[in-house]
Structures are given as structure tokens and as C-alpha cells.
């Protein structure tokens, strides 16, 4: 039984059609921006479904994950990904040129290729490199950038986004020669690529990536029933409920299936579907307990600044008058702008980082799942977490019943 990959062929075909301008109601030719929580199958889909489908249609695809190496500048990762694919195509042209005894050849009557420098993109802008790739291959190009919001953390990264927008405008004058797909695991961060007139792709829309649903559950159920016939028929609705409990995250769901089927770890006297549902609830509870533990372990200043960030979201301003008043109320003492900045720096410096910062000084929680955790705690009247240093101050200010 293999649950490693569930192909989403129809979705890949629909997106490819939209990117190629074959859908009259889609703005995808101007750029497709997909947002989905971590671990919900977005990256797998881009690499194993969308990329092959575009290639099947005769499109040259460049894929780059900006989280592949967070220590390297995002712009460098993008340039190297383009350069690698460009080198592959120019290498083919070079072989043809060498066989003909030529030092230089022209591709499509326009592009001059120096065969002694094949694969090198030094001195080329991103727009020029993409144009050369399209001309050398004779095919349209699709650039897929995973975790694209990370580009906004450096000047070169932000400049690269602006350059890609320019490349799109230049290359698509006479048809769709450059398709751009950008994805992110945090909608709020990805939104910063499009949400104001200073954003590189201002005016574009963020699309929520479709979660795996009943079709995926039916696929999983059929595989299990084929190998474990005593389990048939499985309750699809119960399996779907369990998958939802895992936050629609296939990796954790499938791992729990393996544990529930193993004679070494399967719970006794519990229906398979119920065991999965409980495993999903336990997984989320464990993650939330870890978030609470991490929060409780912070110094008071970092606790209160993170609280403000969770409460305000994109409206967060670290040291405006309202923020400083908030800090004083929750801490029981004043926090200066410099102290608030030190708290933010401390949150960013933790491993893993708890706060993300863009080049323009915009802040967000690093793990978007914290927003859900915070919202649930607020609704349950369980905020701040018991044991947090700021909770003592808040408790003292609450009126006694």
C-alpha cells in the first residue's frame, strides 16, 4: 500500500489552462498567488502535479523553494534556479553549434549565444535570463516560486520580485511567454506582495489553495480496504472527520494511519476510524501545548509584544501610542519603544524564530498556526496561557466576583 502521493491531475490541468490564458474568467496569466497552511500538500502539488502538467503541454518550468536554504538570499536562489535551467537549454544549443564548428549561433534569429560561456548568467538581469531561456528553448516559460513571501526579507529579494513583474510585462506583450506562480504558507505574508501600490505585484489577487477533500479520502480508503479486507467497508465520513482533525495535513494523517494499522502500535478495542480521529485531536493538542509552553517561557516584554502582534495581525505597529498603552496595561509598567524593539529582535532571534520581518519593517508571527491557537484561546477565555508572566498582571486587574 502506497500513500506517498495522491495525484491531483484535474486541479493541475485547470491551473495550467488558466496560466496559459485559456480561461476567460481567470487573471492567472498576470500571476497566480496560492496560499495554503503548512503541510497541506501545496509544495508536493506544485512539484509533482503542476510542474509535470505544464511540461507535458510544452512549457519550460523553473521551480525554486525559497525555504530550501533560508540563510541564502532569496534573489540568489531565484537567479540560480533560472540559471540552471537556462544552462541546460543553452548546453543543448552549444552541442549543435560545436558539431557545426561554430563559435556563436543565433537562436530564433535574435539571440546570440557564445558557446564558451554556456550556462553562465553573470551580468544578465532576471528579465534577460528568462527571455534567453524562452528564446533558447522556443517554448513558454513558467516560474514557480514556493514560499515566495520570503523574498520580502531582503533588498535583493524584493528587487527580484519587481524584476519578475517587469519580465512578465515585457515577455507577454505578444502572447503568454512567461507564467508566474507564487505560493506561500502564510496568507498574510504573501498578501504583502500584492496589497499596496508599493508591492511588486500590486493589484493581483491571493487564491486559497484547494485542500485535499473527499476524493483523497476515497483514495486512501480504497488502498486500505484492498490490503486490510477485514476493515471494509471503511466509514468515509469518519475518515474525513479525522483528516479535518489533523488540519487537512496529509503527512500527519498518513503517519497516523500507519501507526493505527501496525500490530505494534495499533490501539486495542478501538475502531480504526475512531483511533484516527483521536490521533488527530491529540496531534493538535500537542502542538497547542507546545505553543503555550514556548509562550510561557518568554520574558514578559516578549510575551506582551507577541500578544499585541497576535491581536493586531497586519495592523500591528510595534510602538505607536496604542501599542505602548497596551504594553503598559498588560505589564503593569511602561515599555519604551527601544525595549519593544529589543523584544521583537529577541522573538526573531529564537530558534525557531517566532516573528517574521519584511524589509519594509512589517512584522508577522512566523508560524501562522499561532493565530488559530490564539483565537481558540480567546474564545475559550483561556488567554493568556496559565503560567505566563503577564497573566499574573492581567489576573490582578480583573474584578473579583
Regions found by a protein language model. Give the residues of each.
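P-loop NTPase nucleotide-binding core
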Residues: 28-152, 157, 178, 335-337
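Amphipathic alpha-helical "lid/sensor" segments that cap RecA-like P-loop NTPase cores
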Residues: 219-290, 300-301
Amino acid at each position: 500500500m502506497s500513500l506517498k502521493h495522491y495525484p491531483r491531475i484535474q486541479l493541475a490541468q485547470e491551473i495550467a489552462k488558466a496560466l496559459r490564458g485559456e480561461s476567460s474568467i481567470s487573471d492567472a496569466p498576470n500571476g497566480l498567488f496560492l496560499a495554503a497552511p503548512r503541510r497541506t500538500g501545496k509544495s508536493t502539488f506544485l512539484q509533482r502535479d503542476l510542474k509535470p502538467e505544464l511540461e507535458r503541454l510544452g512549457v519550460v518550468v523553473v521551480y525554486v523553494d525559497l525555504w530550501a536554504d533560508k540563510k541564502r538570499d532569496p534573489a540568489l536562489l531565484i537567479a540560480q534556479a533560472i540559471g540552471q535551467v537556462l544552462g541546460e537549454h543553452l548546453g543543448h544549443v552549444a552541442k549543435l553549434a560545436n558539431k557545426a564548428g561554430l563559435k556563436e549561433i543565433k537562436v530564433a534569429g535574435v539571440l546570440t549565444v557564445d558557446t564558451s560561456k554556456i550556462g553562465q548568467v553573470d551580468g544578465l538581469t532576471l528579465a534577460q535570463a528568462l527571455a534567453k531561456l524562452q528564446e533558447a528553448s522556443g517554448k513558454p516559460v513558467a516560474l514557480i516560486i514556493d514560499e515566495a513571501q520570503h523574498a520580502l526579507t531582503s533588498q535583493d529579494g524584493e528587487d527580484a520580485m519587481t524584476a519578475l513583474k517587469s519580465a512578465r510585462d515585457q515577455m507577454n506583450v505578444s502572447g503568454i511567454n512567461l507564467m508566474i506562480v507564487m505560493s506561500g504558507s502564510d496568507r498574510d505574508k504573501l498578501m504583502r506582495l500584492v496589497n499596496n501600490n508599493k508591492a511588486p505585484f500590486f493589484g493581483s489577487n491571493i487564491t486559497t489553495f484547494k485542500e485535499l477533500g473527499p476524493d483523497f479520502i476515497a483514495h486512501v480508503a480504497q488502498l486500505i480496504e484492498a490490503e486490510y479486507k477485514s476493515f471494509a467497508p471503511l466509514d468515509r465520513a469518519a475518515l474525513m472527520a479525522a483528516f479535518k482533525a489533523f488540519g487537512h495535513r496529509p503527512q500527519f494523517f498518513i503517519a497516523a494511519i500507519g501507526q493505527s494499522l501496525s500490530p505494534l502500535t495499533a490501539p486495542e478495542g478501538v475502531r480504526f476510524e475512531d483511533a484516527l480521529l483521536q490521533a488527530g485531536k491529540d496531534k493538535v493538542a500537542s502542538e497547542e501545548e507546545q505553543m503555550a509552553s514556548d509562550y510561557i517561557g518568554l520574558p514578559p516584554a516578549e510575551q506582551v509584544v507577541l500578544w499585541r502582534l497576535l491581536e493586531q495581525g497586519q495592523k500591528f505597529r510595534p510602538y505607536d501610542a496604542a501599542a505602548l498603552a497596551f504594553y503598559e496595561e498588560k505589564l503593569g509598567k511602561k515599555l519604551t519603544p527601544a525595549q519593544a524593539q529589543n523584544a521583537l529582535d529577541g522573538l526573531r532571534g529564537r530558534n525557531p524564530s517566532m516573528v517574521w520581518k519584511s524589509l519594509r519593517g512589517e512584522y508577522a508571527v512566523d508560524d501562522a498556526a499561532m493565530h488559530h491557537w490564539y483565537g481558540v484561546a480567546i474564545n475559550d477565555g483561556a488567554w493568556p496561557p496559565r503560567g505566563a508572566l503577564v497573566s499574573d498582571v492581567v489576573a490582578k486587574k480583573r474584578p473579583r466576583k
